[in-house]
Amino acid sequence: MKEGTKEEMEGKFSKAKGEIKESAGEMTGDIEMEAKGEAEKRKGEAQEKVGKIRKEFEK
């Protein structure tokens, strides 16, 4: 698997994981979990974008 594709997939996974944590934090009133989930989601979004850019350069 090419690096760009791998990076993009890992980013999507981190984004999804962060969204779940963020939602769980909202439902339980756990502000710390909500913040950590949002941070992980943002990191995943950035990683996904980096993967897409790498894929363009791998062509």
From Swiss-Prot:
Residues 1-24, 33-59 have a biased composition (Basic and acidic residues). It comes from the Archaea. Pfam families: CsbD. Residues 1-59 are annotated as: Disordered. This is UPF0337 protein MM_2677. Belongs to the UPF0337 (CsbD) family. InterPro entries: CsbD, YjbJ_sf.
